[in-house]
A protein has these predicted regions:
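Active-site nucleophile elbow and catalytic-triad environment of alpha/beta-hydrolase enzymes
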Residues: 270-286
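Conserved alpha/beta-hydrolase "acid-adjacent" motif
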Residues: 303-310
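Short beta-strand/loop motif that positions the catalytic acidic residue
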Residues: 290, 296-298
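Conserved acidic catalytic loop of the alpha/beta-hydrolase fold
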Residues: 135-155
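Alpha/beta-hydrolase-fold enzymes
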Residues: 177-261
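Catalytic active-site module of serine/aspartate enzymes centered on a nucleophile-bearing elbow/loop
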Residues: 322-359
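Conserved hydrolase catalytic core segment
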Residues: 153-192
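N-terminal cap/lid subdomain of alpha/beta-hydrolase-fold enzymes
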Residues: 61-123, 311
Length: 359
Protein backbone atom coordinates (compact mmCIF):
# COMPACT_ATOMS: atom_id res chain seq x y z
CA UNK A 1 0.00 0.00 0.00
CA UNK A 2 1.41 3.38 -1.06
CA UNK A 3 1.70 6.32 1.29
CA UNK A 4 -0.94 8.18 -0.72
CA UNK A 5 -3.47 5.36 -0.52
CA UNK A 6 -2.81 4.97 3.21
CA UNK A 7 -3.51 8.63 3.76
CA UNK A 8 -6.71 8.39 1.72
CA UNK A 9 -7.86 5.37 3.73
CA UNK A 10 -7.13 7.16 7.01
CA UNK A 11 -9.06 10.19 5.84
CA UNK A 12 -12.08 8.03 4.95
CA UNK A 13 -11.98 6.42 8.39
CA UNK A 14 -11.83 9.81 10.07
CA UNK A 15 -14.74 11.08 7.99
CA UNK A 16 -16.80 7.99 8.80
CA UNK A 17 -16.03 8.31 12.51
CA UNK A 18 -16.96 11.98 12.49
CA UNK A 19 -20.22 11.23 10.69
CA UNK A 20 -21.14 8.56 13.24
CA UNK A 21 -20.25 10.89 16.09
CA UNK A 22 -22.43 13.67 14.72
CA UNK A 23 -25.30 11.25 14.25
CA UNK A 24 -25.03 10.20 17.87
CA UNK A 25 -25.04 13.74 19.26
CA UNK A 26 -28.19 15.92 19.13
CA UNK A 27 -27.95 18.96 16.92
CA UNK A 28 -28.96 21.13 19.88
CA UNK A 29 -27.28 21.14 23.28
CA UNK A 30 -29.18 19.38 26.04
CA UNK A 31 -30.68 22.55 27.42
CA UNK A 32 -34.31 23.59 27.84
CA UNK A 33 -35.73 26.50 25.81
CA UNK A 34 -35.05 29.98 27.10
CA UNK A 35 -37.61 31.11 29.69
CA UNK A 36 -40.27 33.60 28.64
CA UNK A 37 -41.45 36.10 31.25
CA UNK A 38 -45.02 37.20 31.80
CA UNK A 39 -47.34 38.69 34.41
CA UNK A 40 -50.96 38.43 35.40
CA UNK A 41 -52.67 41.26 37.28
CA UNK A 42 -55.78 40.87 39.42
CA UNK A 43 -57.65 44.21 39.36
CA UNK A 44 -58.84 43.46 42.88
CA UNK A 45 -57.69 40.54 45.01
CA UNK A 46 -59.35 39.51 48.27
CA UNK A 47 -57.24 37.70 50.84
CA UNK A 48 -58.39 35.00 53.27
CA UNK A 49 -58.86 37.54 56.06
CA UNK A 50 -61.04 39.89 54.01
CA UNK A 51 -58.28 42.37 53.21
CA UNK A 52 -58.11 43.48 49.59
CA UNK A 53 -55.44 44.79 47.27
CA UNK A 54 -55.85 46.45 43.90
CA UNK A 55 -53.71 45.38 40.96
CA UNK A 56 -52.04 42.38 42.55
CA UNK A 57 -49.34 41.24 40.13
CA UNK A 58 -48.17 37.66 39.79
CA UNK A 59 -45.04 37.35 37.70
CA UNK A 60 -44.11 34.05 36.05
CA UNK A 61 -41.74 32.42 33.60
CA UNK A 62 -42.64 29.70 31.13
CA UNK A 63 -40.71 27.14 29.13
CA UNK A 64 -42.00 25.41 26.02
CA UNK A 65 -45.11 25.68 23.89
CA UNK A 66 -48.54 26.63 25.22
CA UNK A 67 -50.11 23.78 23.24
CA UNK A 68 -48.29 21.12 25.29
CA UNK A 69 -49.56 19.63 28.58
CA UNK A 70 -49.05 22.21 31.33
CA UNK A 71 -46.92 21.66 34.43
CA UNK A 72 -46.96 24.03 37.41
CA UNK A 73 -43.66 24.32 39.31
CA UNK A 74 -43.69 26.01 42.74
CA UNK A 75 -40.64 27.41 44.52
CA UNK A 76 -39.69 27.58 48.19
CA UNK A 77 -39.79 30.43 50.70
CA UNK A 78 -37.43 33.34 50.05
CA UNK A 79 -36.95 32.06 46.50
CA UNK A 80 -38.45 33.05 43.17
CA UNK A 81 -39.06 31.34 39.84
CA UNK A 82 -35.39 31.63 38.93
CA UNK A 83 -34.42 29.16 41.66
CA UNK A 84 -36.28 26.42 39.81
CA UNK A 85 -34.18 27.04 36.70
CA UNK A 86 -30.90 26.21 38.48
CA UNK A 87 -28.62 23.54 37.04
CA UNK A 88 -29.34 21.27 40.00
CA UNK A 89 -33.12 21.44 39.56
CA UNK A 90 -34.27 22.71 36.17
CA UNK A 91 -31.03 21.54 34.59
CA UNK A 92 -31.95 17.98 35.58
CA UNK A 93 -35.64 18.14 34.71
CA UNK A 94 -36.49 20.47 31.82
CA UNK A 95 -33.92 19.57 29.15
CA UNK A 96 -34.27 17.20 26.18
CA UNK A 97 -34.96 13.65 27.31
CA UNK A 98 -35.42 14.68 30.92
CA UNK A 99 -38.58 13.98 32.99
CA UNK A 100 -40.25 17.33 32.25
CA UNK A 101 -38.74 17.94 28.83
CA UNK A 102 -39.80 21.47 27.88
CA UNK A 103 -40.22 20.40 24.26
CA UNK A 104 -43.05 18.13 25.44
CA UNK A 105 -44.49 20.11 28.36
CA UNK A 106 -45.48 23.71 28.98
CA UNK A 107 -43.63 24.59 32.18
CA UNK A 108 -45.10 27.41 34.29
CA UNK A 109 -43.12 28.80 37.24
CA UNK A 110 -44.72 31.73 39.09
CA UNK A 111 -43.12 34.06 41.60
CA UNK A 112 -45.29 33.70 44.69
CA UNK A 113 -47.03 36.67 46.26
CA UNK A 114 -44.40 38.62 48.17
CA UNK A 115 -41.29 37.61 46.21
CA UNK A 116 -39.43 38.27 42.98
CA UNK A 117 -41.29 40.42 40.49
CA UNK A 118 -44.69 39.70 42.03
CA UNK A 119 -46.36 42.27 44.27
CA UNK A 120 -44.62 42.48 47.67
CA UNK A 121 -44.44 44.70 50.77
CA UNK A 122 -41.21 46.39 49.66
CA UNK A 123 -43.01 47.76 46.59
CA UNK A 124 -44.34 50.50 48.87
CA UNK A 125 -46.90 49.33 51.42
CA UNK A 126 -44.28 47.93 53.77
CA UNK A 127 -45.90 46.65 57.00
CA UNK A 128 -49.33 47.83 55.79
CA UNK A 129 -49.32 45.10 53.14
CA UNK A 130 -52.19 42.59 53.52
CA UNK A 131 -51.37 39.58 55.68
CA UNK A 132 -51.28 36.83 53.07
CA UNK A 133 -51.00 33.09 53.67
CA UNK A 134 -50.42 29.97 51.59
CA UNK A 135 -54.11 29.70 50.71
CA UNK A 136 -53.95 33.18 49.19
CA UNK A 137 -50.86 32.24 47.22
CA UNK A 138 -52.55 29.14 45.82
CA UNK A 139 -55.68 31.13 44.96
CA UNK A 140 -53.55 33.64 43.07
CA UNK A 141 -51.85 30.81 41.18
CA UNK A 142 -55.22 29.29 40.30
CA UNK A 143 -56.56 32.61 39.04
CA UNK A 144 -53.38 33.28 37.10
CA UNK A 145 -53.77 29.95 35.31
CA UNK A 146 -57.51 30.07 34.67
CA UNK A 147 -58.18 33.78 34.18
CA UNK A 148 -54.82 34.94 32.92
CA UNK A 149 -53.60 32.00 30.84
CA UNK A 150 -56.81 30.16 29.99
CA UNK A 151 -55.53 26.89 31.46
CA UNK A 152 -58.20 24.62 32.92
CA UNK A 153 -56.10 21.53 33.58
CA UNK A 154 -52.53 20.61 34.50
CA UNK A 155 -50.61 17.45 33.83
CA UNK A 156 -48.59 17.85 37.02
CA UNK A 157 -47.93 20.13 39.98
CA UNK A 158 -44.48 19.82 41.52
CA UNK A 159 -43.34 22.03 44.38
CA UNK A 160 -40.42 22.25 46.79
CA UNK A 161 -40.54 23.24 50.47
CA UNK A 162 -43.14 26.05 50.56
CA UNK A 163 -44.03 24.94 47.04
CA UNK A 164 -44.46 21.41 48.36
CA UNK A 165 -46.89 22.59 51.02
CA UNK A 166 -48.78 24.54 48.39
CA UNK A 167 -48.92 21.42 46.22
CA UNK A 168 -50.72 19.68 49.09
CA UNK A 169 -53.14 22.62 49.29
CA UNK A 170 -53.74 22.46 45.54
CA UNK A 171 -54.66 18.78 45.80
CA UNK A 172 -57.33 19.35 48.43
CA UNK A 173 -58.64 22.71 47.23
CA UNK A 174 -58.85 21.96 43.51
CA UNK A 175 -59.10 18.16 43.33
CA UNK A 176 -58.57 16.78 39.86
CA UNK A 177 -57.19 20.03 38.44
CA UNK A 178 -53.88 18.20 37.94
CA UNK A 179 -53.32 14.60 36.90
CA UNK A 180 -50.55 14.14 39.46
CA UNK A 181 -48.97 15.84 42.46
CA UNK A 182 -45.33 15.85 43.56
CA UNK A 183 -44.96 17.66 46.90
CA UNK A 184 -41.35 17.76 48.08
CA UNK A 185 -39.59 18.73 51.33
CA UNK A 186 -42.96 19.17 53.00
CA UNK A 187 -45.70 17.58 55.05
CA UNK A 188 -49.46 18.15 54.82
CA UNK A 189 -49.81 18.47 58.60
CA UNK A 190 -50.26 21.81 60.35
CA UNK A 191 -47.26 24.07 60.80
CA UNK A 192 -45.95 23.13 64.24
CA UNK A 193 -43.05 21.81 66.31
CA UNK A 194 -39.49 22.92 65.50
CA UNK A 195 -40.45 23.91 61.96
CA UNK A 196 -42.80 26.61 63.23
CA UNK A 197 -40.78 27.52 66.32
CA UNK A 198 -37.75 28.35 64.19
CA UNK A 199 -39.87 30.37 61.75
CA UNK A 200 -41.48 32.24 64.63
CA UNK A 201 -38.06 33.02 66.13
CA UNK A 202 -36.85 34.18 62.73
CA UNK A 203 -39.69 36.68 62.46
CA UNK A 204 -39.51 37.79 66.10
CA UNK A 205 -35.76 38.39 65.97
CA UNK A 206 -36.34 41.02 63.28
CA UNK A 207 -39.50 42.54 64.73
CA UNK A 208 -37.87 42.98 68.14
CA UNK A 209 -34.88 44.78 66.65
CA UNK A 210 -35.41 48.53 67.31
CA UNK A 211 -33.91 49.21 63.88
CA UNK A 212 -36.92 47.52 62.27
CA UNK A 213 -39.05 50.42 63.56
CA UNK A 214 -42.40 48.76 62.84
CA UNK A 215 -41.37 48.34 59.22
CA UNK A 216 -40.46 51.99 58.69
CA UNK A 217 -36.68 51.57 58.45
CA UNK A 218 -34.44 53.43 56.01
CA UNK A 219 -31.68 50.80 56.03
CA UNK A 220 -32.09 47.07 56.52
CA UNK A 221 -32.06 46.07 60.22
CA UNK A 222 -28.80 44.30 61.23
CA UNK A 223 -30.88 41.49 62.69
CA UNK A 224 -31.97 40.45 59.20
CA UNK A 225 -28.56 39.08 58.23
CA UNK A 226 -28.03 37.34 61.57
CA UNK A 227 -31.53 35.86 61.70
CA UNK A 228 -31.34 34.57 58.15
CA UNK A 229 -28.01 32.82 58.66
CA UNK A 230 -29.03 31.39 62.01
CA UNK A 231 -32.16 29.91 60.43
CA UNK A 232 -30.27 28.47 57.47
CA UNK A 233 -27.62 26.80 59.63
CA UNK A 234 -30.26 25.39 61.98
CA UNK A 235 -32.81 24.11 59.44
CA UNK A 236 -30.93 23.40 56.22
CA UNK A 237 -27.71 21.87 54.95
CA UNK A 238 -27.67 18.36 56.41
CA UNK A 239 -25.79 17.01 59.42
CA UNK A 240 -23.43 14.77 57.45
CA UNK A 241 -22.78 17.45 54.85
CA UNK A 242 -21.85 20.03 57.48
CA UNK A 243 -19.60 17.51 59.19
CA UNK A 244 -17.85 16.96 55.87
CA UNK A 245 -17.33 20.62 55.01
CA UNK A 246 -17.05 22.11 58.50
CA UNK A 247 -15.70 19.26 60.59
CA UNK A 248 -13.07 21.36 62.35
CA UNK A 249 -13.42 24.52 64.40
CA UNK A 250 -11.49 26.48 61.78
CA UNK A 251 -13.65 25.20 58.92
CA UNK A 252 -16.85 25.99 60.80
CA UNK A 253 -15.68 29.51 61.63
CA UNK A 254 -14.67 30.07 58.02
CA UNK A 255 -18.12 29.04 56.79
CA UNK A 256 -19.84 31.37 59.26
CA UNK A 257 -17.52 34.24 58.29
CA UNK A 258 -18.27 33.67 54.60
CA UNK A 259 -22.03 33.63 55.17
CA UNK A 260 -21.94 36.78 57.28
CA UNK A 261 -19.84 38.58 54.67
CA UNK A 262 -22.00 37.53 51.71
CA UNK A 263 -24.16 40.21 50.06
CA UNK A 264 -27.71 40.34 51.39
CA UNK A 265 -30.39 41.48 48.97
CA UNK A 266 -33.41 40.62 51.13
CA UNK A 267 -35.85 43.17 52.50
CA UNK A 268 -36.84 42.80 56.15
CA UNK A 269 -40.57 43.40 55.62
CA UNK A 270 -40.68 41.01 52.67
CA UNK A 271 -38.79 38.49 54.80
CA UNK A 272 -41.23 38.75 57.71
CA UNK A 273 -44.23 38.28 55.43
CA UNK A 274 -42.66 35.38 53.55
CA UNK A 275 -41.95 33.32 56.64
CA UNK A 276 -45.04 34.44 58.54
CA UNK A 277 -47.28 33.35 55.68
CA UNK A 278 -46.84 29.72 56.75
CA UNK A 279 -48.28 30.27 60.25
CA UNK A 280 -51.75 28.80 59.64
CA UNK A 281 -50.71 26.22 57.06
CA UNK A 282 -52.58 22.92 57.38
CA UNK A 283 -53.37 20.83 54.32
CA UNK A 284 -54.46 17.76 56.31
CA UNK A 285 -58.23 18.45 56.11
CA UNK A 286 -58.06 18.28 52.31
CA UNK A 287 -56.18 14.99 52.01
CA UNK A 288 -59.31 12.86 51.65
CA UNK A 289 -60.29 14.90 48.59
CA UNK A 290 -57.13 13.98 46.68
CA UNK A 291 -57.95 11.28 44.13
CA UNK A 292 -54.97 11.61 41.77
CA UNK A 293 -51.56 9.91 42.06
CA UNK A 294 -49.16 11.49 44.53
CA UNK A 295 -45.39 11.09 44.78
CA UNK A 296 -44.17 12.74 47.99
CA UNK A 297 -40.40 13.23 48.10
CA UNK A 298 -38.58 14.04 51.34
CA UNK A 299 -35.06 13.48 52.61
CA UNK A 300 -34.01 11.50 55.65
CA UNK A 301 -31.95 14.41 56.95
CA UNK A 302 -34.61 17.11 56.50
CA UNK A 303 -34.30 19.29 59.59
CA UNK A 304 -37.78 20.77 59.19
CA UNK A 305 -39.66 17.59 58.31
CA UNK A 306 -37.88 14.77 60.19
CA UNK A 307 -39.20 11.42 58.93
CA UNK A 308 -38.84 9.72 62.33
CA UNK A 309 -42.00 11.48 63.56
CA UNK A 310 -44.11 9.21 61.34
CA UNK A 311 -46.28 12.18 60.34
CA UNK A 312 -45.96 11.52 56.61
CA UNK A 313 -46.74 7.82 56.87
CA UNK A 314 -49.89 8.57 58.85
CA UNK A 315 -51.00 11.36 56.52
CA UNK A 316 -50.53 9.32 53.37
CA UNK A 317 -53.02 6.74 54.63
CA UNK A 318 -55.62 9.37 53.74
CA UNK A 319 -54.46 9.39 50.11
CA UNK A 320 -55.01 6.03 48.38
CA UNK A 321 -52.08 4.97 46.24
CA UNK A 322 -49.78 7.78 47.38
CA UNK A 323 -46.07 6.99 47.24
CA UNK A 324 -43.38 8.28 49.60
CA UNK A 325 -39.74 8.51 48.55
CA UNK A 326 -37.31 9.27 51.38
CA UNK A 327 -33.85 10.11 50.07
CA UNK A 328 -31.19 8.52 52.32
CA UNK A 329 -28.92 10.94 54.17
CA UNK A 330 -25.29 11.20 53.11
CA UNK A 331 -22.48 13.72 52.87
CA UNK A 332 -23.88 14.53 49.42
CA UNK A 333 -27.37 15.44 50.61
CA UNK A 334 -28.21 18.84 52.07
CA UNK A 335 -30.92 18.28 54.65
CA UNK A 336 -34.00 20.32 53.84
CA UNK A 337 -32.20 21.51 50.71
CA UNK A 338 -31.72 18.01 49.29
CA UNK A 339 -34.81 18.10 47.08
CA UNK A 340 -33.39 21.13 45.30
CA UNK A 341 -31.01 18.64 43.67
CA UNK A 342 -33.15 16.63 41.28
CA UNK A 343 -30.47 14.04 40.57
CA UNK A 344 -31.54 12.26 43.74
CA UNK A 345 -34.99 11.43 42.38
CA UNK A 346 -34.92 11.76 38.58
CA UNK A 347 -35.54 8.04 38.08
CA UNK A 348 -38.51 7.86 40.45
CA UNK A 349 -40.02 11.05 39.06
CA UNK A 350 -39.69 9.73 35.51
CA UNK A 351 -41.45 6.50 36.45
CA UNK A 352 -44.19 8.41 38.25
CA UNK A 353 -44.90 10.67 35.28
CA UNK A 354 -44.90 7.73 32.88
CA UNK A 355 -47.45 6.01 35.11
CA UNK A 356 -49.95 8.89 35.16
CA UNK A 357 -53.29 8.13 33.49
CA UNK A 358 -53.34 8.91 29.78
CA UNK A 359 -55.39 11.89 28.64
Amino acid sequence: MTLTSSLRRAARLLLTSATLLLAAVPLHAAEPPKPVEGSWVAPRFQFHNGQTLDNLRLHYVTLGERSNPAVLVLHGTYQSAGAMLSKDFGGQLFGPGQPLDASKYFIIIPDGIGVGKSTKPSDGLRAAFPQYNYDDMVLAQYRMLTEGMGISHLRLIIGNSMGGMQTWIWGGTYPGFADGLVPMASQPSEMASRNWMMRRMLVESIKQDPAWNNGNYTTQPPSLRLANNMFVFATNGGTLAYQAIAGTHAQADKLVDERLAAPLTADANDFIYQWGSSADYNAAPGLSKIKVPVLAINSADDERNPPETGIMQAALKEVPGAQLLVIPASAETRGHGTTGMARFYVRELTQFIQGLPAR
